């Protein structure tokens, strides 16, 4: 099982991850959540984070992914909003329930899985000043 999780983490590891031009603060992440249509904070080797990334990828949903591993400010921001990973925001609002909630939304074709044009396009990263 660990080998499978490692392989999935390597495949989905850094796709769509926001690296930005410099060090971002918790306030910067808050601003990013307000600006972005769809954003998810993940742990690279967390099985729920891997499953959520896989689901978004398979359904063609463009969502900004922030890896919190080795990023204390991103981790602190995510943990302040939700106790487990992944931490998912849609239109600036926290979607509670993590991976399980994403599966329910996907099965019901609800946002972000309703093929809204803003969510299925590849969006350029928002660079904060």
UniProtKB/Swiss-Prot annotation:
GO CC aspect terms: cytoplasm
Chief place where the protein resides: cytoplasm
SUPFAM superfamilies: Thioredoxin-like
GO molecular function: oxidoreductase activity
InterPro entries, per the entry: Glutaredoxin, Thioredoxin-like_sf
Gene3D superfamilies referenced in this protein's UniProt entry, alphabetically: Glutaredoxin
Keywords of the record: Cytoplasm, Electron transport, Redox-active center, Transport
Domain (Glutaredoxin): residue spans on this chain: 26-126
Protein's UniProt keywords contain rRNA processing: no
Annotated compartments: Cytoplasm
Residues that span the membrane, as ranges: none
Entries under Pfam families matching the protein: Glutaredoxin (PF00462)
Similarity field: Belongs to the glutaredoxin family.
Function (record text): Has a glutathione-disulfide oxidoreductase activity in the presence of NADPH and glutathione reductase. Reduces low molecular weight disulfides and proteins.
Name of this protein: Glutaredoxin-like protein ECU08_1380
């Amino acid at each position: 099982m660990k080998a499978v999780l490692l392989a999935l983490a390597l495949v989905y590891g850094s796709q769509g991850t926001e690296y930005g031009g410099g060090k971002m603060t918790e306030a910067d992440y808050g601003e990013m959540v307000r600006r972005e249509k769809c954003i998810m904070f993940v742990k690279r080797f967390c099985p729920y984070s891997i499953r959520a990334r896989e689901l978004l990828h398979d359904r063609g949903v463009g969502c900004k992914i922030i890896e919190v591993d080795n990023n204390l400010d991103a981790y602190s921001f995510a943990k302040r909003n939700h106790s487990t990973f992944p931490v998912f925001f849609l239109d600036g609002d926290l979607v509670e329930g993590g991976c399980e909630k994403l599966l329910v939304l996907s099965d019901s074709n609800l946002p972000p899985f309703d093929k809204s044009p803003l969510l299925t396009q590849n969006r350029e990263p928002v660079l904060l000043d």
